[in-house]
Regions:
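Long, charge-dense tracts
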Residues: 53-57
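Acidic-and-aromatic substrate-binding clefts and catalytic sites of carbohydrate-active enzymes
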Residues: 60-62, 132, 244-250
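Non-catalytic accessory segments adjacent to catalytic cores
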Residues: 59-94, 99
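Active-site/acyl-donor-binding loops of N-acyltransferases
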Residues: 2-27, 31-44, 85-104, 235-319
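Well-ordered, non-membrane alpha-helical segments in soluble/globular domains
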Residues: 61-71, 159-165, 220-226
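A conserved beta-strand-loop-helix scaffold within acyl/acetyltransferase catalytic domains
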Residues: 2-47, 82-89, 97-215, 230-231
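Aromatic (often tryptophan-rich) hydrophobic motifs at membrane interfaces
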Residues: 168, 173-281
Length: 319
C-alpha cells in the first residue's frame, strides 16, 4: 500500500515529503526531547506551554477539523497551529531564498560587514553528526540556559548517551544535515536543515553567547550566509525556507532573516482551540481579554507572551 505524501507550498513543479520521511523526522525530534506525534499525515510537536504546532513551514496540511480537535483532546493542549493552503487561515510571512546567484550583494550592508568580520575568525561549513556530538556541547549548553531549558525537556541534550541517540536518529532522516560555524574545534553556531524535493527547510539553530569583542560575536551571521550560499548552489535545490514569523512575533529575528537575504512570502496558518474551550473563547471579547492579560503581565511572567496563540485561535478559529 502506498504511503501518503504532503505537497509543498510554492515548490517549483511541485514536490512532496513521504510518510516514511516524516516518521524518521518524528524520531529525530523525539530523540531531541520534543514531544512529537505523526497524526493525520502531519508531524506535530509541542510549542510553548499552551499549543501544538505542525513542524514543516513549507508543507500545507489537508487535515480535517475533527482530527485536529481529537489531537487537542489527546494531548491536552489548548490550541493547535498548522499550515494550510493559500486562501485559508491567517496570513503571516515565511522567509524564503530563491536567488540561485545568491552572494554578499544580497545582504544588508551591516549584515555583510558582520559576515566579513566573522569570516576572519571562524570557519563555516557542513559538519558531521560525529562532530556535532562532541564539538557543540558548549553551544547547546549556552542555548538551553538562554532559553530557560533547565530542567525542561532538552536537558538530556548534554548527556553523551542522548547525543549518540540523537545522532543515530538524525542519520535515519533522508537529507537531514548540519551547517556549522567553528571557532577552532568548537562549534559556535549551527543550523539543522532538511531537504525534500526542491525545497530545503531550516529546522533548528543554536549559538553560543558572545561578548561584544568576542571572535564568535557574529557567528550566526556567517552561519546563515554560508548555509544559504552552499545550499542554493545545489542544482537539486530551488528554494530555502528558514521559517515563518513566530507567534508572538520576534521582530529582531524577522529583521535578521531579511537582512540575510531571505524574502517574505505568504504562509497561511489555521488555529483551532481545544473542544472544551472553543465555546468560550471563539469570540472577540475573549480575545481582547486575553490580550489585556498578556500585555499587562507578560513583562512579569514571560510565559504569558504565548497567550497570543490563544488570542489568534479565538479570533481566527472560524477561518
Amino acid at each position: 500500500m502506498n504511503k501518503p505524501t504532503q505537497e509543498i507550498a510554492g515548490g517549483n513543479g511541485g514536490a512532496s515529503i513521504s510518510h516514511s520521511a516524516l516518521g524518521a523526522l518524528a524520531g529525530f525530534y523525539s530523540a531531541w526531547g520534543r514531544r512529537t506525534m505523526l497524526q493525520g499525515g502531519v508531524l506535530w510537536f509541542d510549542c510553548g506551554a499552551f499549543s501544538t504546532m505542525s513542524v514543516l513551514t513549507t508543507v500545507p496540511t489537508g487535515i480535517a477539523d475533527r482530527e485536529v480537535r481529537g489531537i487537542l483532546s489527546r494531548t491536552r493542549k489548548l490550541a493547535a497551529v498548522y499550515r494550510v493552503a493559500a486562501g485559508a487561515g491567517l496570513e503571516v510571512p515565511m522567509f524564503v531564498l530563491r536567488d540561485k546567484e545568491y552572494s554578499p550583494s544580497n545582504l544588508q550592508r551591516q549584515f555583510r560587514q558582520h559576515v566579513e568580520r566573522a569570516s576572519s575568525f571562524l570557519e563555516a561549513r557542513e559538519c558531521s553528526w560525529e562532530e556535532w556530538e562532541t564539538c557543540a556541547l558548549n553551544c547547546d549548553r549556552q542555548t538551553l540556559a538562554r532559553q530557560g531549558g533547565f530542567p525542561q525537556p532538552g536537558q538530556g541534550l548534554l548527556c553523551p548517551s542522548v547525543r549518540r541517540r540523537i545522532a543515530g536518529a538524525a542519520r535515519a532522516v533522508p537529507r537531514l544535515r548540519i551547517h556549522a560555524c567553528f571557532h577552532g574545534k568548537e562549534i559556535a553556531a549551527y543550523l539543522i536543515h532538511v531537504a525534500f524535493g526542491e525545497m530545503c527547510e531550516g529546522l533548528l539553530a543554536h549559538r553560543v553567547d558572545s561578548e561584544i569583542d568576542s571572535p564568535t560575536r557574529h557567528a550566526s551571521h556567517l552561519l546563515y550566509f554560508s548555509f544559504a550560499r552552499a545550499t542554493i548552489s545545489d542544482p537539486d535545490i530551488q528554494a530555502i525556507c528558514v521559517g515563518r514569523q513566530s507567534i508572538p512575533a520576534k521582530e529582531s529575528l524577522t529583521r535578521f532573516k531579511r537582512h540575510a537575504g531571505f524574502l517574505p512570502e505568504p504562509c497561511h496558518l489555521r488555529f483551532r482551540l481545544h473542544p472544551l474551550l472553543a465555546p468560550f473563547l471563539e469570540n472577540g471579547f475573549s480575545a481582547a481579554l486575553l490580550k489585556r492579560v498578556r500585555v499587562g503581565l507578560s513583562g512579569k511572567i514571560p510565559a504569558l507572551a504565548n497567550l497570543e496563540v490563544m488570542e489568534q485561535a479565538g479570533l481566527c478559529s472560524r477561518r
